[in-house]
UniProtKB/Swiss-Prot annotation:
Chemical reaction(s) catalysed: Hydrolysis of terminal non-reducing N-acetyl-D-hexosamine residues in N-acetyl-beta-D-hexosaminides
Binding site for substrate: D62, R70, R134, K164, H165
GO BP term, pick one: carbohydrate metabolic process
Family annotation (NCBIfam families): PRK05337.1
Protein's UniProt name: Beta-hexosaminidase
Protein's gene: nagZ
């Protein structure tokens, strides 16, 4: 059973990491800024993983744009998602730029032989420390319009879309990287606002995966959504009819600590309905989980999980140099970089 996504410690693949990646529980890999020096180095690292690990691995990254962009030097400066509606007055231009950003991000990552970037963020509003300008908008209708275009751009390249952080991380001030946030709003309000983007995009068949939040919604359930069968099985699967893959958010984050030690976090998230579990920045915990985590599942559930995983691999391979010579890439690079520069200037002025 392959369910874990783990990470690497540096810019080179070590022998002990090859052994971890070949463990039967490991389904994939997530890359971070510490794994990146320049384009040639990251291409070599990914090529090493593909060649030396003797099984298919889902290689992933957080390359959303704005402040969450793991690879920078030599890549397009993707604008923060908030910038589209904030800086561009024409709705058609907003949507066009969102499409360009989704296409550009997916094209650059696919050219590196990366399968998936965990995007887009579907959280409403900008007040949450962990979300901020990663959110498209504070109003669900506008957010849905822009997210649709971003995803359509990704899909043009053949990359799957992951909506996060279900059912919505935008209305808590605390950062789940550092603590477990609590959202005390009424259930009716969450369903009337935060869930709408997920609901709409699922109905349109635009989400291939969903990542739940490490947030406790106190008026709905006493567990974080990432470890809650109410949110994942009852709401996401049954009420919204979602049939794609469910990723846990990083179980190494402090926000997941509510569920116990690392093995307990994996156990609870899996039982709650997650298909794939991320465990990052905790190398000792990875070894502990691989040694002690013994998930029990029926053959049918394993087949369903593997089918969902298989659908997330990239649909095509793009040559890096060919991409950079394309007219579309060059035009997008110029426009998106300019918008991000305008956004940084705007934020500096605003502060």
């Amino acid at each position: 059973m392959s369910i874990l996504l783990i990470d690497l410690s540096s810019q080179e693949l070590r022998q002990e990491e090859i052994e971890l990646l070949e463990h039967p529980l490991v389904a994939g890999l997530i890359l971070f800024s510490r794994n990146f020096y320049d384009i040639e180095q990251i291409r070599h690292l990914i090529r090493s993983v593909r060649q030396k690990v003797k099984k298919p691995l889902l290689i992933t990254v957080d390359q959303e744009g704005g402040r969450v962009q793991r690879f920078r030097q030599g890549f397009t400066q993707l604008p923060a998602m908030q910038s589209f509606a904030c800086l561009l007055s024409d709705p058609q231009e907003q949507q066009e730029m969102a499409w360009r950003a989704g296409w550009q991000m997916a094209a650059e990552m696919t050219a590196l032989d990366i399968d998936l970037s965990f995007a887009p963020v579907l959280d409403l509003g900008h007040q949450c420390k962990a979300i901020g300008d990663r959110s498209f908008h504070y109003e669900e209708k506008k957010l849905i319009e822009l997210a649709e275009k971003f995803i359509q751009g990704m899909r043009q390249i053949g990359m799957s879309a992951t909506g996060k952080h279900f059912p919505g991380h935008g209305h808590v001030l605390a950062d789940s990287h550092l603590e477990t946030p609590y959202d005390d709003r009424a259930k009716e309000l969450i369903f009337a606002q935060d869930i709408r983007p997920f609901q709409s995009l699922i109905k349109q068949g635009l989400l291939d995966a969903v990542m739940p939040a490490h947030v406790i919604y106190t008026q709905c359930d006493n567990q974080p959504a990432s470890g809650s069968s109410y949110w994942l099985k009852e709401v996401l699967r049954q009420q919204l009819g979602f049939q794609g893959a469910i990723f846990s958010d990083d179980l190494g984050m402090k926000g997941a600590g509510f569920m116990g030690d690392f093995v307990a976090r994996c156990t609870q998230s899996l039982q709650a309905g997650c298909d794939l579990l991320l465990l990052c920045n905790e190398p000792e915990a990875v070894v502990q989980v691989l040694d002690r985590f013994k998930p029990q599942e029926s053959q049918n559930k394993r087949i369903i999980r593997q089918t969902r995983l298989n659908k997330l691999f990239k649909k095509q391979r793009i040559d890096w140099q060919t991409l950079r010579n394309q007219r579309d890439w060059l035009e997008n690079h110029k426009k998106l970089t300019a918008l991000q520069q305008d956004w940084l200037a705007y934020k500096g002025y605003d502060n």
